[in-house]
Amino acid sequence: MTGILRTAACMLLLAGLAYGHHSFTAEFDEHKPVKMTGKVTEMKWSNPHGWIYIDVTGPDGKTVNWALETGGANALYRRGWRKEDLPAGTVLVVEGWQARNGTPTANVSSITFTNGKRLFAGSSNSDAPQQ
């Protein structure tokens, strides 16, 4: 019986840690929306989150590489994304929310290509703001 209780306690603890890791509000600030234009330097097609890296040139002329968290590969595929959609050099307009820690990191809600095509890129977290 104590083995079952220990197992249950461990599962509850780990579930809480997993939820905290994937919580939008723990990592991103819904009061800090960002919109930026940049060129893709890399796309990591992975689960549980994909990552797009883009170079953004600021008003001061300095280029900063932003790390942009998306939904996972399976979710992106269901939304119409394909790996070949984002080769290096592709220009994108990205909308999302900045990381709470102030780094050039954001959770992406959508991207728009220069031809006007728009794709939803957000994670499926229920606590992420809806646009």
List PLM regions with ranges.
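Short, structured beta-strand/loop micro-motifs enriched in basic residues and often containing a Trp
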Residues: T70-R78
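OB-fold/S1-family single-stranded nucleic acid-binding modules
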Residues: A99-S123
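Short aromatic-glycine-enriched beta-strand elements
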Residues: S46-V56
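Conserved hydrophobic positions within beta-strands
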Residues: M36-V40
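Bacterial N-terminal signal peptides that target proteins for export
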Residues: M1-A9
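Short boundary/loop segments of OB/S1/cold-shock single-stranded nucleic-acid-binding domains
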Residues: G20-V34
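Short nucleic-acid-contacting surface segments enriched for D/E, G, S/T with interspersed K/R
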Residues: Y77-V94
